[in-house]
A protein has these predicted regions:
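Short C-terminal tail/terminal secondary-structure segment
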Residues: 547-550, 702, 713-729
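Catalytic Tyr-X3-Lys loop
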Residues: 537, 557-573, 593, 617, ...
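Canonical Rossmann dinucleotide-binding motif of NAD(H)/NADP(H)-dependent dehydrogenases/reductases
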Residues: 443-473
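Substrate-binding pocket helix/loop in short-chain dehydrogenase/reductase
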Residues: 551-553, 557-562, 682
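Glycine-rich flexible loops
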Residues: 1-448, 460
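Active-site helix of classical SDR
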Residues: 576, 613, 621
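Short, small/polar-rich loop/turn modules that mediate ligand/substrate recognition or access, typified
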Residues: 629-633, 712-714
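Residue(s) in the substrate-gating loop at a strand-loop-helix junction
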Residues: 597
Length: 729
C-alpha cells in the first residue's frame, strides 16, 4: 500500500535482528515519530510474549505494554511494564464480585492498584491506566494511537455513521468511555461480538487496533489512519480546502517581522499575568496551520467548545483563551486591554467550570490561568512549567486544530462534555500521579541569561544553573562560542519530549545568542530574542569582561581605557537599563548579578584601567540595587586570580605574570603547565591555599540567583580564596 498521509518506516532488516520486546520498542518508536499517528506522550502499544517464569521455570504469556508516562517516540525497554497476562485476565473475576461497579466507580479505580500484583519479573515500571485495553483484547499485538484523522472522526457529531461509512465492518465504533477497566471490558465484548473486526474508533478519544503479527499490526495502524485521512481530505477539498477552512479568513496574518515585534512587546507582560500563581515558560507557534485557524471566522466558536481527546485537555485545559483582536486596525495597547479582560473572564469561567463539575472528593482547584492563548494575526502562545511542557502543550493544540479541521470538513465538531472532561482533569488517579512528582529544583520555571557564556566563568555558570532546572540563554560576543555552550547543555540534558514551537521558540533548555553589551541596540535585540524563545526572562548574570594590558612603557592608551570601561562598567549598565523595561512589564521578581573583582579594592601597578573599572562596577552594583528595587535584586561576584579556564588569562598574559612574579618557566613549556604554575602561585597567597576555579565562581552566582539570599541586594560576594588585602570594608 502506498501511504500519502503517514510515514511507513518498518524495516525488515532491522527487525530481523531484534528479540520480541525489542521489536515492540521499535514499533513504538516508529509509530511515535510521526505526529500524524500519535501526539507526544499519547497512545500505547503492547505485545503478548511467551517468557520463562522466573519462579516456576515454565513458559507463561507476558503482556509487555508501554507503562505510565513516557513517550512512544523516545521509549526504551525501561518504559514498558511487563505483567502476567493470565493474572490480568483473572482480575475480571475480582471485579465481578464488587457490589457497585461500572464506569468511574471506586471499584473501577481500585483495579488500577491491583495491576502491581500481576507484575512479571519485578519490573518496576508502573502500569498504564490503559493496561486492560491491551490485556482484554484477545490478540498478540495491540496499537492504541491518537491520530488526528481518527480523532476527527471520533469527535464528529455523527461519528458512528462516519465510522461505518469509512471502514465498513473492519472497524467498530464505541461511544466515549473513560480509559480504564470498563473500557477494557467493552473492547473485549467488541472482539467477541465482531470476530472479524480489526479495530475500534473510540468515541471522542482515538483509535485502537490489533493483529497476531507485529508488522501486520503496524501496517494496519497506518492503513486505518490513511483511510480516515483520505476520506477527510477529499471532503475538505470539495468544501474549498484551505481557502474555506474554518469558515474562511476573518483577519490577515501580520508579516513575520511585525509578528516578532508584537510578540516581543506583549509576551513579558502576558507572562507576568499568567504567572501569578506559578511561573510559566512560553512557546510561540505561528506556522501556516495555526494562523489559518486563529484568523478564521469560526475560530471563536470552535475555541470556546474546547478540545476532545483526553491527552489534549490535560495540557491545554478545557479550552484556550481566544482574543478577538483585529491585527489590521488595532494596536498593541488595545491587544493588552483585550488580553487583560480575556484573562479575567477565563479565570471566572474556569472557576465556574470547577464549581459546577466538582465532586465531594475532587482535588482543590488548580491554576485558573489559560495554557493556550490564540491571537489573530499572530498565532498561538502555549505555557508550561518548563520549555518541554509548553512545547507539548503547543503540539497538543496543533493536534486539536487538525482534529477540528477534519471534523468540520466531514460533519460538525463536538467537544467532550465538560463533566467528562472534568472527571479526567481532576481524576484522583491523575492527582495521585501529580503528587508523586519529585519536588521542583531550585531554579525551575526560571529563564536566566548568562552574558559571557562562551567561555570561562560564564560557561561554568550556564552549566551550573541548568543543572538546577533553569532555562539558560547563553550570550556571548562570539556567537559560535555561545552556540557551543548551548549545544553542550542540550546534548547533556536533551530538548525534552515536546516537538512544537516555531522560530527561536523551537528550542530546549538552552539557546545561544550573540550580543555586544556596549551596543544598546544589540542588547535590546538579544533580550527580545530571549522573549521570543521563552516568553520572558527572570534573571541575568553578566560575566563578560576585559583586561587590557598596558603597552611596553606601562601606559594605557585612551582607546584601551575607554574600551575597558565600556565593557566592564557601561555594558553592565546598558544591560540593566534595557532589562529593566522587560522586568517592569513582567512584574515578576528577578535578579541581576554582575562580575566585579577583588582588584576593585586593591591598588597595584600594571592594571590601572581594569582595577578602576572594577571599582566602578562595585558601586554600579549598589546604585542599580537602589534603582531596580524592589522588583530586582542586584548583587555582584568579585573573583580573583581565576586562571584556569579563563579567557582573560591567555598564554601571553600568563607568561607576563610569571615573569612579573619571578616564577621560573620555559618559553616552550605547554600552556597548561604554565597556567598551573600561576594558579598555584596565586593559591599560595590566599588564606585557604586553594586555586580558584570558574566552578567556584559559578557556585556564588548560583546562590545569588536562587531564593537562598532573597533578602540580600546591593552586595558584593568575594570569591578569592581569602585575600586579606581585598577584604571589603
Amino acid at each position: 500500500m502506498n501511504y500519502r498521509r503517514v510515514n511507513y518506516l518498518w524495516d525488515d532488516d532491522v527487525t530481523s535482528k531484534l528479540d520480541p520486546v525489542e521489536r515492540l520498542i521499535y514499533r513504538s518508536n516508529i509509530l511515535g515519530s510521526d505526529q500524524r499517528i500519535t501526539n507526544t506522550g499519547g497512545g500505547n502499544t503492547s505485545s503478548k510474549i511467551t517468557k520463562q517464569d522466573p519462579l516456576t521455570g515454565e513458559n507463561v504469556e507476558v503482556l509487555w505494554v508501554k507503562g505510565s508516562g513516557g513517550d512512544l517516540r523516545t521509549s526504551k525497554r525501561e518504559n514498558f511494564s511487563s505483567l502476567y497476562q493470565q493474572k490480568l485476565v483473572d482480575l475480571q473475576k475480582l471485579y465481578a464480585k464488587e457490589p457497585e461497579k461500572g464506569p468511574k466507580t471506586p471499584a473501577e479505580d481500585k483495579m488500577v492498584a491491583m495491576y502491581t500484583h500481576a507484575t512479571f519479573n519485578l519490573n518496576p515500571r508502573a502500569s498504564s491506566i490503559d493496561t486492560p485495553l491491551h490485556s482484554f483484547i484477545p490478540f498478540k499485538h495491540v496499537d492504541h494511537m491518537h491520530p488526528n484523522a481518527a480523532i476527527a472522526v471520533a469527535a464528529a457529531k455523527n461519528s458512528e455513521r462516519l465510522t461505518k461509512e469509512i471502514y465498513g465492518d473492519e472497524v467498530i465504533w464505541t461511544p466515549w468511555l473513560r480509559p480504564g477497566f470498563e473500557l477494557g471490558l467493552a473492547l473485549q465484548r467488541v472482539c467477541a461480538e465482531h470476530p472479524n473486526a480489526k479495530g475500534v474508533i473510540l468515541g471522542q478519544h482515538g483509535l485502537i487496533n490489533w493483529a497476531n503479527d507485529d508488522k501486520e499490526c503496524y501496517e494496519l495502524t497506518l492503513s486505518l489512519i490513511e483511510k480516515a485521512a483520505n476520506y477527510i481530505e477529499a471532503k475538505y477539498e470539495r468544501k474549498g480546502g484551505d481557502a474555506k477552512a474554518f469558515g474562511g479568513p476573518k483577519y490577515q496574518t501580520l508579516d513575520e517581522v511585525r509578528r516578532s515585534q508584537v510578540f516581543a512587546a506583549i509576551l513579558p507582560w502576558l507572562r507576568g499575568r499568567v504567572s501569578q500563581k506559578n511561573r510559566f515558560i512560553g512557546t510561540i507557534q505561528d506556522d501556516e496551520n495555526i494562523l489559518r485557524f486563529v484568523n478564521s471566522s469560526d475560530a471563536p466558536r470552535l475555541a470556546e467548545l474546547g478540545t476532545s481527546c483526553p491527552d489534549h485537555f490535560l495540557r491545554t485545559k478545557i479550552k484556550p483563551l481566544y482574543v478577538d483582536w483585529n491585527p489590521q486596525s488595532e494596536d498593541v495597547d488595545v491587544l493588552k486591554k483585550k488580553l487583560q479582560s480575556g484573562l479575567q473572564k477565563y479565570r471566572q469561567d474556569y472557576a465556574a467550570y470547577y464549581n459546577r463539575c466538582k465532586r465531594p472528593n475532587s482535588p482543590a482547584m488548580r491554576d485558573p490561568n489559560p495554557t493556550v492563548i490564540l491571537i489573530p494575526g499572530l498565532g498561538m502562545v502555549a505555557w508550561g512549567k518548563d520549555k518541554s511542557e509548553s512545547r507539548v502543550t503547543a503540539e497538543f493544540y496543533n493536534c486539536a486544530v487538525e482534529v477540528m479541521r477534519g471534523a468540520e470538513a466531514i460533519d460538525q465538531y463536538i467537544a467532550l462534555p465538560q463533566q467528562e472532561a472534568f472527571d479526567i482533569e481532576y481524576w484522583l488517579l491523575e492527582e495521585a500521579k501529580l503528587q508523586r512528582m519529585p519536588a521542583e529544583k531550585s531554579l525551575a520555571r526560571q529563564v536566566i541569561a548568562v552574558i559571557g557564556a562562551g567561555s570561562g566563568i560564564g560557561k561554568e555558570v550556564a552549566h551550573r544553573i541548568v543543572k538546577e532546572g533553569a532555562h539558560v540563554v547563553c550570550v556571548d560576543l562570539n556567537k559560535d562560542a555561545a552556540l557551543a555552550t548551548a549545544k553542550e547543555i542540550t546534548d547533556k540534558y536533551g530538548v525534552g519530549i515536546g516537538v512544537a514551537g516555531t522560530g527561536l521558540s523551537d528550542c530546549g533548555p538552552a539557546v545561544g545568542l550573540s550580543a555586544n553589551i556596549t551596543d544598546r541596540a544589540s542588547v535590546r535585540a538579544m533580550l527580545n530574542d530571549t522573549v521570543l524563545a521563552y516568553g520572558g526572562f527572570d534573571s541575568i548574570a553578566i560575566t563578560a569582561g576585559i583586561f587590557v594590558s598596558p603597552d611596553t612603557t606601562g601606559h594605557i592608551p585612551d582607546d584601551k581605557w575607554g574600551l575597558t570601561f565600556a565593557i566592564n562598567v557601561t555594558g553592565s549598565y546598558v544591560v540593566a537599563d534595557e532589562a529593566a523595561k522587560t522586568w517592569q512589564e513582567q512584574g515578576l521578581q528577578g535578579n541581576l548579578v554582575l562580575t566585579t573583582s577583588a582588584n576593585a579594592v586593591v591598588a597595584k601597578k600594571g592594571s590601572l584601567a581594569y582595577d578602576t573599572s572594577k571599582a566602578a562596577a562595585n558601586h554600579l552594583t549598589r546604585e542599580l540595587a537602589m534603582e531596580l528595587a524592589p522588583l530586582v535584586r542586584v548583587n555582584a561576584v568579585a573573583p580573583a586570580t581565576v586562571v584556569q579556564g579563563s579567557a582573560m588569562f591567555p598564554r601571553d598574559r600568563v607568561i607576563a605574570s610569571l615573569a612579573k612574579y619571578k616564577i621560573p618557566y620555559a618559553e616552550d613549556e605547554p600552556t597548561e603547565s604554565l597556567t598551573q604554575k600561576l594558579a598555584q602561585f596565586y593559591a599560595d597567597r590566599t588564606l585557604t591555599r586553594s586555586p580558584i576555579t570558574p566552578a567556584d565562581q559559578a557556585e556564588a552566582f548560583y546562590i545569588l540567583l536562587t531564593k537562598a539570599l532573597s533578602k540580600t541586594t546591593g552586595q558584593v560576594i568575594t570569591v578569592d580564596g581569602g585575600l586579606h588585602e581585598a577584604f571589603l570594608r
